[in-house]
A protein has these predicted regions:
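Long hydrophobic segments that form regular secondary structure
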Residues: 44-71, 160, 166, 186-199, ...
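Short coil-to-beta transitions that initiate beta-strands within beta-rich domains
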Residues: 7-9, 33-56, 82-102, 127-145, ...
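Low-complexity, Gly/Pro
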Residues: 1, 142, 171, 193-198
Length: 209
């Protein structure tokens, strides 16, 4: 169980009524949330919800389509209903880049939730410890496969990150290569085979640095 919606960040509000809509009760201060065995979702909230449905065969059960997957509640009318993550292999994430390292991990960068490092593609991965938001570019050094580079973010939270220990720790490069105090973000990255030189083509510029 983790902290109630909105879990320290933005999230939608949920209401129930038992009198045809004359009165509504806000659930956000009462409900609990569970990651459903998917650890990476435990810092997230239900948000951008596009649809809700009550099970016609079990009116205690509700399913919600969130911006990050599906949440289900089996006890919606209880005093403290519990929503749990119910997406098995269909998380609502957007991969921007995926690299399979020969003999190593499957590494990805995705929208909103940074990305994953997976030892087994059939199992849930571990979110990058940087937790840097939306990442758009990823590269792995061909002869130094513990060295990875990624980029992403926006003007408010730009990001160019690198790791030399296969994602155990990440370093954020604060320097922006652009002139006139313009902040670089997004785009694509590259890394030399030996992992000594990084390349960045920011999404808001036409050059490679």
């Amino acid at each position: 169980i983790y902290v109630p919606q909105p879990n320290g960040q933005f999230g939608d509000e949920f209401y129930v009524t038992t009198d045809g809509g004359k009165n509504w009760t806000l659930l956000n201060e009462k409900m609990k949330m569970s990651d459903g065995g998917v650890e990476w979702i435990s810092t997230a909230s239900m948000h951008w919800c596009s649809s809700m449905a009550i099970d016609p065969n079990n009116t205690n059960k509700v399913m919600v389509v969130s911006g990050n997957g599906i949440f289900t509640c089996d006890n919606i009318w209880d005093e403290n209903p519990e929503f749990y993550f119910f997406s098995k292999g269909i998380e609502e994430t957007v991969p921007y880049d995926i690299i399979s390292i020969p003999g190593g991990k499957l590494v990805s960068v995705i929208g909103d939730y940074d990305g994953f490092a997976q030892d087994n593609a059939e199992e849930y991965g571990v979110v990058h410890s940087s937790v840097a938001g939306s990442m758009t570019g990823l590269a792995v050094a061909a002869k130094a496969t513990d060295t990875w580079v990624k980029c992403g973010g926006d003007e408010e939270k730009p990001g160019f990150w690198y790791t030399t220990d296969a994602g155990k720790t990440w370093n954020n490069v604060k320097y922006s290569p652009l002139e006139n105090n313009k902040i670089a973000y997004g785009g694509y990255v590259g890394v030399s085979a030996d992992g000594k030189r990084f390349f960045w083509a920011p999404g808001n510029d036409s050059s490679i640095y």
